[in-house]
Amino acid sequence: MKEKDNFEMVINFKRAFMGRRNQRTKRAIKMIRNIVQRHFGAEKVIIDPLLAKSITYNGRDKIVRKVRVAVKKIGEKTYLVRLALKSE
């Protein structure tokens, strides 16, 4: 099986909207970590501050519904998650 070093994926935050409104950002960040750990077998997941800022650009309780992320392997079982930008 081919190693996943660079990968783009879309993460849907539908489950982050369940529960209290002021916990949405925390749940969304935790969802990103859990999804990357599950798909790549990562032990350490580093989230880019620009990605966290783009999730909450409307405020802490009004997060975006979906986000496209780029996952890059930077070490042994260590992954960096960044915001994937469209190239035109």
From Swiss-Prot:
Lineage, opening ranks: Archaea, Thermoproteota, Thermoprotei, Sulfolobales, Sulfolobaceae
Keywords: Ribonucleoprotein, Ribosomal protein
Similarity comment: family membership: Belongs to the eukaryotic ribosomal protein eL31 family.
GO MF term (any one): structural constituent of ribosome
Superkingdom in the source lineage: Archaea
One cellular component (GO) term of this entry: ribonucleoprotein complex
GO biological process: translation
Pfam families, A to Z: Ribosomal_L31e
Protein name: Large ribosomal subunit protein eL31
InterPro entries: Ribosomal_eL31, Ribosomal_eL31_dom_sf
